[in-house]
Amino acid sequence: MVDKQRTLPELLAPAGDMERLKMAVLYGADAVYLAGTDFGMRAFAGNFDPDELKAAVAYAHAHNVRVHCTINTMPRGDEIVRLPAHLERLNDAGVDAVIVADLGAFTLAGKYAPNCQRHISTQASISNYVTANAWYDLGASRVILARELSLEEIRTIRENTPAELEIEAFVHGAMCVSYSGRCLLSNYMTGRDASRGACAQPCRYHYALMEEKRPGEYFPIEEDEKGSYILNSRDMCMIDHLDDLLDVGLSSLKIEGRAKSAYYAAIVTGAYRHCLDDAAAGRPIDPVWRDEVEHVSHRPYATGFYYGYPGQYYENSRYIREWQVV
């Protein structure tokens, strides 16, 4: 049972557009994360133009919800020159924090968005306390850890970093087969750059083996006649393990899914909100909320790397869609 005196972490929900932002806010998010039309890792999420961003911040703040804006691509020289103006717009709109991965973007954020906290993206692959402390010394107020860490590794980071440094981790949603999204497959195979939010997800393709001297003959790795899903990942779901997440001292629990539906934003945010509130009150988790996250479109659930190295899911990459919104 969770100590009801324990400080609850922030519940951070995705907001791909205004409709999804409203769902996340109304269903209990403490904060939302979104992107402008540039510099975000979800190019097809909808995102917010400058006027929409102002309206989004105003709506969230009216409900006492914080807004974090992603600038977590790795900008090239022709892109970085546009970043100061973008940062100034975020600062003027009242965005609470910017999420960055590139050191240059981090530096510019300190200059052009002084009212915004600087959070270090999972794209930076922070996996140890030395790296976390280095970012803190540079002025970061939060680090978003690599998804590949176990609970014990997170505990070690928390025990060896200043209490003022907030630590955020993903607890629900899609996972990348590459190390915290650092994947070149999409760029190589389709020309769509994953580091600029345009990943084509070739890890979800149907693969088979072909022997060099037998072109055209394909050998399934598993029994699936379409080939094996050798790079495929399950989706993360930690709703049954909130006690363990709270024990390691996380400051923020993050839900993946800016490209997902408004229904997803509502159901998943609401389920985690109720479970966290139950934890705060010392109540056992009601299994109805675990059932709720089964109602959204998802791949088979797993706990990621939190309890060690996960097994591979070879069967297929299809979403489970057993429920419809009416």
Where would I find each of the regions flagged by the language model?
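Gly/Gly-Pro- and Ser/Thr-rich, intrinsically disordered tail segments characteristic of DNA damage-repair
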Residues: 81, 116-129
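Surface-exposed amphipathic alpha-helical tracts and adjacent flexible/coil segments at the periphery
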Residues: 1-26, 31-34, 38, 63-73, ...
